[in-house]
Amino acid sequence: MSQNIGKISQVIGAVIDVEFEPGKLPPIYNALRVTNPAIDDNENNLVLEVAQHLGENSVRTIAMDSTDGLVRGQAVLDTGKQISVPVGRKTLGRILNVIGEPVDEMGPVNADKEYGIHREAPEFVDQSTKVEAFTTGIKVVDLLAPYARGGKIGLFGGAGVGKTVLIMELINNIAKQHGGFSVFAGVGERTREGNDLWMEMKESGVLDKAALVYGQMNEPPGARARVALSALSIAEYFRDEEGQNVLLFIDNIFRFTQAGSEVSALLGRIPSAVGYQPTLATEMGELQERITSTNKGSITSVQAIYVPADDLTDPAPATAFAHLDATTVLSRQIAELGIYPAVDPLDSTSRILDPQVIGEEHYAIARQVQYVLQKYKDLQDIIAILGMDELSEEDKLVVARARKIQRFLSQPFHVAEAFTGSPGKYVELKDTIKGFKEIVDGKHDDIPEQAFYMVGTIEEAIEKAKKLAV
């Protein structure tokens, strides 16, 4: 088959128009290749993805790398297929870019199989309808805002409250307890953070259980708008071909939308609300619908969500919320108390915190814990003004238990062992429920609150109390 070659007719930033001979237009989503001397000395080093057909013989494409150095009339090769990325176990421990090339200087990936990045969501008949909780081993999450297997979790939090550490602990727990793999998509985030994550994962020994796909802030919008899809294809392979329960991390889902909005105007689309692309909900839906449980395995995704100007009604975060099953909110106030993970127990929510899914006992204890913490929050103003002595005996008891619960919600992480000096703890769900039940029932009213800080199970708290008493 002869090669289909076109030529560049127009370059507008990240958007390139390419002219082909009549009747030889490449289909939408096809990958085209062109040589850009400004990137490096390799031939056909720039990938363009067909986004629109213009008239008889022109296509409008989005570039996946820098377009500086391109000129009109340059030859463009149609590869005849969409952007494909290597999949399978060879991708574990590697860093890939949007087009599946390794960027960790550790040689080629040599995978046996490739997947296209645009794939159909699983058919209804293949999807699993069973709703079950996904145990993470992190007490605060499992008790108060449990994750659903094959669900989507939004991770909210400002800078420096522990999003990355929480993500790394989840990767660690999935690898060690469930033997599963994780895929991390760095979408439009800081390159330094991407490097830090790689280094920390290497040090904590979880790197060989995860594949990393990066399209960071310095990349053109084309790469940032597609890198989440590349990572998702790698995760889909582990789910569909190996029957794994995969964890997919997307940091940050807002940047996916932001990149789409950057190229949307260049593609000639009329902007919609707040200047976002008119296809915002469709693009988000195409990505999110592929993240699901099937009869073979599941992809559970944790997505960090940046909220522009803290406005939750902004179209970008608002569209993402529509797809979420659970939210984990990290709070600076809790981090300031030294309680890590700094998850806000009253602000975090889950769709499966429901007695029909998690059982009556778990549900009742979670609600009791929330009640005690809420009551303590309501009493804090009185305590600040009048002091503890002005409270009734009943309220004093509530405050004492709430402070114990607050500390018992903290937990030493495996990935933070190097910094904290205490060994990490994975807490089974039954132990979590038992521990909080005993605190709420008043079985440990005699134990000092510091005994509950940074321990795993309630037995450890009792042991710690004995040591403190000596």
From Swiss-Prot:
Binding site for ATP: G157, G158, A159, G160, V161, G162, K163, T164
Keywords linked to the UniProt accession: ATP synthesis, ATP-binding, Cell inner membrane, Cell membrane, CF(1), Hydrogen ion transport, Ion transport, Membrane, Nucleotide-binding, Translocase, Transport
Matches recorded under CDD domains: ATP-synt_F1_beta_C (cd18110), ATP-synt_F1_beta_N (cd18115), F1-ATPase_beta_CD (cd01133)
Main location: membrane
InterPro entries noted in UniProt: AAA+_ATPase (IPR003593), ATP-synt_VA_C (IPR055190), ATP_synth_F1_bsu (IPR005722), ATPase_a/bsu_AS (IPR020003), ATPase_alpha/beta_chains (IPR050053), ATPase_F1/V1/A1_a/bsu_N (IPR004100), ATPase_F1/V1/A1_a/bsu_N_sf (IPR036121), ATPase_F1/V1/A1_a/bsu_nucl-bd (IPR000194)
Protein name: ATP synthase subunit beta
Job description of the protein: Produces ATP from ADP in the presence of a proton gradient across the membrane. The catalytic sites are hosted primarily by the beta subunits.
Transmembrane spans: none
Molecular functions per Gene Ontology: ATP binding; ATP hydrolysis activity; proton-transporting ATP synthase activity, rotational mechanism
Domain of life (superkingdom): Bacteria
GO cellular component: plasma membrane; proton-transporting ATP synthase complex
Organism phylogeny: Bacteria, Pseudomonadati, Thermodesulfobacteriota, Desulfuromonadia, Geobacterales
Organism: Geotalea daltonii (strain DSM 22248 / JCM 15807 / FRC-32)
Family: Belongs to the ATPase alpha/beta chains family.
Record has Hydrolase as a keyword: no
Keyword DNA damage among UniProt keywords: no
Topology in the lipid bilayer: Peripheral membrane protein
Cell compartments where the protein resides: Cell inner membrane
Subunit structure, as described in the record: F-type ATPases have 2 components, CF(1) - the catalytic core - and CF(0) - the membrane proton channel. CF(1) has five subunits: alpha(3), beta(3), gamma(1), delta(1), epsilon(1). CF(0) has three main subunits: a(1), b(2) and c(9-12). The alpha and beta chains form an alternating ring which encloses part of the gamma chain. CF(1) is attached to CF(0) by a central stalk formed by the gamma and epsilon chains, while a peripheral stalk is formed by the delta and b chains.
PROSITE patterns in alphabetical order: ATPASE_ALPHA_BETA
EC number(s) on file: 7.1.2.2
Reaction it catalyzes: ATP + H2O + 4 H(+)(in) = ADP + phosphate + 5 H(+)(out)
